[in-house]
């Protein structure tokens, strides 16, 4: 496992003694960095060390939608604590998608702490860490290596997909139910035909180009 770029401000503590005494490990992951529309979601999960680990956990991207939905409910039941958060399209356009993703993860951990679950260590998928008031490290490919991160990836993915299904009910012509906002040929064609909705990310090139051509939907 590889640690990301950790500053003293992000850490506050040396991880070596912390890792040796971890009881409550918090896994964190995001969903939705690549889409052209919709918020970016993040989840934080702490499993109860007194309970058997849930089987079937894996990176959400390799699971079917039905499997993710089934695991979502089991994770929520089995976890000691969990929290889902997001950063809005406006925040994505203002901060950029990387910083908005960090903000969503920070909110997920904060929400978990506000529920009374205090992690000894936070492990985040990827190579960068959000600023949180706990020891934190980044784990490259953590969503396939660390069960708590796998669980977080599933919660974030399912929550975001549900949000895009809601958008589909309002804007069925874009096919959000099929691509969840990702830049598929179907989505790009709809963007070119119908224009950008208020839920599209203006800072992303295909959306920016559509707006420049006067293609805006309300």
Curated annotation (Swiss-Prot):
Gene Ontology MF terms in the entry: manganese ion binding; RNA binding; RNA-DNA hybrid ribonuclease activity
Amino-acid positions noted as binding a divalent metal cation in the UniProt annotation, renumbered to this chain: 29-30, 125
Record-linked Pfam families: RNase_HII
EC number, as in UniProt: 3.1.26.4
Cofactor names: Mn(2+); Mg(2+)
Cofactor note: Manganese or magnesium. Binds 1 divalent metal ion per monomer in the absence of substrate. May bind a second metal ion after substrate binding.
CDD domains listed in its UniProt record: RNase_HII_bacteria_HII_like (cd07182)
Name of the protein: Ribonuclease HII
GO cellular component term, pick one: cytoplasm
Family: Belongs to the RNase HII family.
Subcellular location: Cytoplasm
Single GO biological process annotation from the record: mismatch repair
Domain RNase H type-2: 23-216
Catalytic reactions on record: Endonucleolytic cleavage to 5'-phosphomonoester
UniProt xrefs under PANTHER family: RIBONUCLEASE H2 SUBUNIT A (PTHR10954), RIBONUCLEASE HII (PTHR10954:SF18)
């Amino acid at each position: 496992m590889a640690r990301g770029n950790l500053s003293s401000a992000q850490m506050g503590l040396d991880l070596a003694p912390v890792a040796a005494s971890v009881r409550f490990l918090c896994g964190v992951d995001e969903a939705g960095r690549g889409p052209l529309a919709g918020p970016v979601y993040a989840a934080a999960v702490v499993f109860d060390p007194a309970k058997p680990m849930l089987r079937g956990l894996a990176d959400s991207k390799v699971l079917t939608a039905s499997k993710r939905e089934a695991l979502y409910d089991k994770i929520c039941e089995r976890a000691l604590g969990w929290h889902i958060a997001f950063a809005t399209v406006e925040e994505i356009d203002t901060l950029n998608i990387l910083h908005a993703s960090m903000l969503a993860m920070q909110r997920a951990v904060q929400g978990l702490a506000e529920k009374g679950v205090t992690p000894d260590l936070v492990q985040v998928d990827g190579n960068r860490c959000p600023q949180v008031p706990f020891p934190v490290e980044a784990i490259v490919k953590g969503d396939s290596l660390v069960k708590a991160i796998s669980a977080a990836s599933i919660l974030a993915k399912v929550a975001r997909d549900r949000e895009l299904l809601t958008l589909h009910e309002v804007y069925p012509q874009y096919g959000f139910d099929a691509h969840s906002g990702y830049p598929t040929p179907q989505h790009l064609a709809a963007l070119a035909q119908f224009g950008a909705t208020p839920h599209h990310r203006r800072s992303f090139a295909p959306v920016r180009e559509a707006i420049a051509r006067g293609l805006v939907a309300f």
